[in-house]
A protein has these predicted regions:
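Short, charged recognition helix plus adjacent turn
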Residues: 138-144
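Generic structural marker for isolated residues within well-ordered, non-membrane alpha-helices
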Residues: 43, 88-89
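Short, amphipathic alpha-helical "recognition" segments used to contact nucleic acids or chromatin
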Residues: 59-86
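Short, Lys/Arg-enriched N-terminal segment that forms or immediately precedes the first helix
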Residues: 42-55
């Protein structure tokens, strides 16, 4: 057998694992929120939570976008290019960007910051925890 044909066996194994992978992706991609009208409320809460005197406007926006994408479209933070319809427009308007494409262009660096910088992870985690408490307290989401 030609050594290049070994790829066939690798493909067979990958195809066998695919259904489990798809189930896992489907389950992990379920958003905690779907109603985009909550984004302005999330923005207000995040502004209240963040110490805006200690972080730049840019840093705040990045933390806020991470939290919004995690709540509405978590697969985006894992590299999926598809977001839920309308989220970029809402974020662009709230964050005063000229076009929704600016939101899309920010995603790779937000992902990189989360992966590479512990202080970013901690700050986002703290903000997310406090936002989640408010969401649960308001009955917007039920304990996750």
């Amino acid at each position: 057998m030609h050594k290049d044909f070994a790829i066939i066996r690798e493909l067979e194994l990958a195809i066998q694992k695919k259904p489990d992978s798809l189930d896992s992706i489907s389950h992990l991609s379920i958003p905690k929120l779907t109603d985009l009208t909550y984004i302005p409320l999330l923005y207000r809460w995040c502004r209240e939570i963040a110490d805006l005197d200690r972080i730049s406007k840019k840093e705040f926006k990045r933390r806020f976008m991470f939290i919004v994408f995690f709540l509405y479209s978590p697969s985006v933070l894992a590299g999926d290019k598809r977001t839920i319809n309308g989220i970029r427009c809402v974020l662009a308007e709230i964050l005063d960007y000229h076009a929704p494409s600016a939101i899309s262009n920010s995603i790779p660096s937000i992902i990189a910051d989360y992966k590479n910088y512990a202080d970013f992870r901690v700050a986002v985690g703290d903000m997310y925890t406090r936002v989640l408490e408010r969401l649960e307290g308001q009955g917007i989401i039920v304990g996750i």
